Amino acid sequence: MSDALAGLRVVEIGEQIAAPYCTKLLVDLGAEVVKVERPAGDPLRSWGPGGGLFEYLNAGKHGLTVDLGMSSGLAQVHEMIAQADVLVEDLPAGSADRFEWGLDREALERINPGLVVVRISDYGQEGPRRAQPSTPLTLQAAAGWVNTREFGRAPVQAGARIPEYIVGGYAALAALTALRISTVEQDRVVEADVSAFEALLSTLPYPMLLAERLKSMGLPPNSKAAPMLGIVRAADGWIGINCLTGQHWLDVCAMMGLPEFGEHQLAIMLGGPERDEFFAKAQPWLDSMPVADLVELSQAMRIPAAPINDGSSILDCPQYRDRDFFVDAGPEGARFQRPGAPFRLSKTPAGAPRPAPLLGGADTVQWSTGRERDASEADAATPFAGLKVFDLSTFWAGAYLTCYLGAFGADVVKVESIQRPDGHRYSGSLLRSSDDWYEVGPLWQGTNLNKRDVTLDLSSDAGLELARRLAADADVVIENFSPRVVEQFGLDYDSLVKINPGVIMVRMPGFGLEGPWRDYVGWALNIEQLSGMSAVTGYADGPPCNLQGPADPIAGVHATVALLAALEHRRRTGEGQLIEVAQIEVGAAVTAEPVIEYSLTQRVREREGNRHRHYAQGVYAAAGEDDWVALSVRDDADWAAVTEVVGRPDLRDDPKFVSADARLAHHGEFDEVIAEYAATRSAEEFAEALLGRGVPAQRLMTGDRMYDVDQLDARGFYEDLDHRIAGRQRFPGWPFRITPGPSRHHRSPSPTLGQHNDEVLGALGLTPDEISTLRERRVIGERLLNA
């Protein structure tokens, strides 16, 4: 049994989380990675207790410690690169080191033509912001990730450095996509330019599209409404109860004995007096219910609910425990538990974790057998051309995967029915303004570009038989329902492999295909809640907070990475396989630090709000209404610049602020100084003044301003597409540019319901009369029933 990426050779010149997580995913899939470190080592070695996070991100890699300032050190690195397939680096955009170290494109083409190079930076290698100073907080602020999560509190960032893992996931996706292009461009370096800023934008639920829609209807463009109930306190802890449809809300009201609030969902979501009245009556009932009982009751009613797991409780969660997801790692005397691989491949499973490299690693590293590089007839602009994808996805996670494949050339056929269309069509259903409302929802459109659409009633014999015929001809089948859904139709892997032995099937259940909770309802919010993402987000003295949805595209990215590895395995061996991506395991994989830290210290770290462990920073109200600025003071030079901007040079050498440690010790007083000045200026003015002096700062981004960003314009992040009903709209692209590679992000707008029925079914050999009969029997159709 070989690994999916057996023979793939990767050199990593990266630190902290994003680049190491990118290559960690490749290691999980069987690639061989050499991590290059300078003598001082990756700073992550000293982050947190026992270096556990470094061990997690760098397990199984070879180590090469060199002084890149010396010619002998560079020669060693160049020797490794000359034999590699992929180089992953995270040097700042425009860094002089890239040229001095011979890592620029021209130098690399002399060393290794045909190399894939993944360059990770904050804003990308080009554009007016490419050299702008930033920190994880200010990047989150710029991308709309710092927002109001708790009524009455300042907007707050996502915790536990989750966004950095997201960037690493996209970098792995870029690497494997560029690898397919390199089979066409064998004598050229293929570069993937990954923007962390764009990666964070790419995981948002299309707020720029929603803002345009709300404005067109005369409504405020930046809605702060969040699904009810959200995260609430029960008898013995926090629980997430998530009403993502109108039926969920009615069921929750009935469950709590409060049916009179069934007609007031929107008013309660928006925080009016109805909200206070509702919770005054709901909280006593919640206080009487243990979390476990409330989760079980809610799930029995098909209401998405989950406990709020932290680094301790997640280890005792029945679903994770039954699936043996957390594994032992670390050296003797410092053992800890960490997440396992975030995907399971039936024919090429990930092995047990191996140790991370020690600093001062071997002078030479011997690669194992290299990868065979067969020439491809594909076009570099469409690296997935010829790939047939049968898309049984619903909502966001699976649809995000198939949208990506279709963008770069795959023929994706999405299956819905006029009786039960993709539930994403109902997202934003409160905005119904025409008979075709189900065709124009921002979330539906954004996740279903680049596809063809057929409708098949799978409850009918004729519809199910046609689905099986489509699956029999597919290279890849994708689904992300609860496990029992495709199994009851006989469309699971064991059934499909009998009619299509080489098929690769990707299953993306919320909770996994096995375990006591496998049939629980899994939506993004309760995935975030169960996996620890919510527990680390928010203020120390407040409740855990939802991230509002990124778990879906994060799972989609990880599933795509696993699929591309499986396609590489099939290229070499002809063998298909089943890929299982349990979304709760992806969530835990990108929230690794809390469980690692707890298992090393037996302590659960408090939520950190907007603070950082090593320097002072925060989010502050500016003079405008609901206008906020985020800033970080990384060092004494930043602090000196801040004192000049706020007109308090006397504070530069104040003992309370004279060093990073002093500023952390007096963070409350630091906040007061910044807040007092921020309240007198617009957020944009304050941020620009700080940026002009080299201090990381950003005005908090909102949906209605996301189309007006010079950096995104310069990099062509948005793309206009004409929809037959919605007209021309601008859609976000993917957070990387591959050169040589695709010149466009998307190939076609989202399809209308059943738009390609005649085309797809005709290709199966059905006559026009047979197709007409199917339409008369409502096996297929082009209009939603009971709309």
For each of these PLM feature ranges, what is it?
Residues 125, 153-162, 183-200, 218-224, ...:
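Conserved Rossmann-fold dehydrogenase catalytic segment
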Residues 1-9, 233, 311-391, 615, ...:
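Terminal low-complexity tails and localization/encapsulation signals of metabolic enzymes
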Residues 33, 299-313, 412-415, 691-705, ...:
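Short, well-structured beta-strand/strand-turn elements
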Residues 223, 227-301, 305, 616-693, ...:
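Aromatic-enriched alpha-helical interface/lid elements that frame and gate functional surfaces
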